[in-house]
From Swiss-Prot:
This is Tetrahydromethanopterin S-methyltransferase subunit H. It comes from Methanocaldococcus jannaschii (strain ATCC 43067 / DSM 2661 / JAL-1 / JCM 10045 / NBRC 100440). GO terms for molecular function: tetrahydromethanopterin S-methyltransferase activity. Its EC number is 7.2.1.4. Part of a complex that catalyzes the formation of methyl-coenzyme M and tetrahydromethanopterin from coenzyme M and methyl-tetrahydromethanopterin. This is an energy-conserving, sodium-ion translocating step. MtrH catalyzes the transfer of the methyl group from methyl-tetrahydromethanopterin to the corrinoid prosthetic group of MtrA. The lineage of its organism: Archaea, Methanobacteriati, Methanobacteriota, Methanomada group, Methanococci.
Length: 319
């Protein structure tokens, strides 16, 4: 284990602290709800869903937070403005912790930022995300909102190297005119969470992991990623699981994906990650104990470097 020379920022969003030196604060874990084809969703366009089932999933993740000490975040995904607004209104009613406003649609993200501001729960929200694709209209909505936290994506499609990721943060790299950190600051973002933008194996996955160390060493900001996308996009694993299913080994095929999924998250934790977007919130019961174990190992090793874990750290609660 190691200690960064640069002072490490610790941000507090809706009562959860994220950041610090490795071994100091537990890894924050964000589970996604209302994702594509989520079985609790009845109408993806209108945002109609099983409220009892959704609340149960959020409560189960909160229970794992209480058990392990790892801060829980709810990553709310919606494909349309109507759906995402419906979802975040509901989550704000049943959950007082941080939630991410997430969509592949800029219109939906803008609607969510406006709604969170109007309804008075913007301080609970994390925008996802400030990146090289953000246009002037979406950026202006973010500027005018009350949001103070955002994922800042260090991804340059023209340069997937570690240097490229650092450049896109500082000067826009080969794609944007301004650095993402400058955009975040001018938008009133006080709490930037740097996402190293993990891409598939063979296309920059390793650089994204290495960038985690570089970002913390250079800037001291909290860092993390949605690294579970690696096994999801792994062609070999997809084909291997298909072969198992065809051979009648359906449970084994499912188990192998779960192992790789959770294992990928642990790579981000070991790479000095402060937060992990771990995928479906349904997997909280598997992800939290595994990450808590790795957090405890890191904290124990960091003690020799003079780093003391906080009282709610898994090392203090579970060891």
């Amino acid at each position: 284990m190691f200690k960064f020379d640069r002072e490490q920022m610790v941000v507090e969003i809706a009562g959860r602290k994220i950041g610090g030196q490795p071994g100091e604060y537990p890894t924050a874990l964000a589970g996604t709800i209302f994702y594509a084809r989520h079985k609790i969703v009845e109408d993806e366009r209108k945002g109609i869903f099983d409220k009892a089932a959704a609340e149960d999933l959020i409560n189960k993740q909160a229970e794992m937070e209480d058990i392990t000490g790892n801060p829980a975040l709810v990553q709310v995904f919606g494909g349309t403005p109507e759906a995402l607004v419906n979802y975040i209104d509901f989550v704000a009613e049943v959950w007082d912790g941080p939630m991410l406003l997430d969509s592949t649609s800029g219109e939906a993200r803008m609607a969510a930022a406006k709604r969170a501001t109007e309804a008075g729960y913007a301080k609970q929200c994390i925008y996802n995300s400030i990146n090289v694709s953000i246009d002037e209209q979406e950026y202006q909505v973010l500027v005018e909102s009350d949001l103070e936290a955002s994922i800042v994506l260090c991804f340059d499609p023209m340069d997937p190297t570690v240097e490229g990721k650092i450049n896109v943060l500082t000067n826009g790299g080969k794609t944007a005119d301004k650095g993402m950190l400058e955009l975040a600051e001018k938008a009133g973002i006080k709490y930037p969470l740097i996402d190293t933008a993990v891409t598939p194996l063979g296309n920059g996955a390793g650089a994204a992991v290495r960038a985690s160390f570089a970002v913390k060493a250079l800037f001291g900001y909290p860092v993390g990623s949605g690294i579970h996308n690696i096994p999801s996009a792994w062609d070999w694993l997809r084909e291997f699981r298909k072969q198992l299913r065809e051979a009648g080994e359906r449970e084994k095929a499912k188990d192998i994906h779960h192992v790789c999924d959770v294992g990928a998250n642990l790579v981000q934790v070991m790479a000095s990650g402060d937060f992990v977007l771990y995928g479906p919130i349904d997997n909280a019961y598997m992800t939290f104990p595994a990450v808590a174990m790795v957090d405890a190992i890191i904290a124990e090793a960091a003690k020799e470097l003079g780093i003391e874990p906080i009282d709610t750290h898994p090392f203090k609660k579970l060891v």
